[in-house]
Amino acid sequence: MGQMLETRRRMIRSRGRTMRLIRRATNGVPQQTVDLMGFPRLYRPGEIEGAIQQGDQQVEILADELDAAGFGAPTTGHLLVLDGRQVTLQGARPIYEGADLIGHSLWVRG
């Protein structure tokens, strides 16, 4: 394990909250859910550009919980239950340390 992963784990453990990521059922594939820890934050005014809107959030998660659940990578259209409300993934960016996938940075709205 690298330093970036350990730093990310500490941040999510200290500031994170429990949330649920949901892949909706499509084309005969059943709905899948995974409970995980994530660290949400609002985008700062200087970060609001392009398709990002005021009120959108960035959520940092680890890859460990997704891997353990066999969930796969989060993608646009997945749902996230955050603080009791449901938001929709607008995008997700994988986070690597070297060649190792260590997490995802999610862009959510709702």
Located regions from the model:
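Active-site-proximal polar cores
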Residues: 1-32
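Short, conserved turn/kink motifs that form compact alpha/beta structural patches or helix kinks used as
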Residues: 20-110
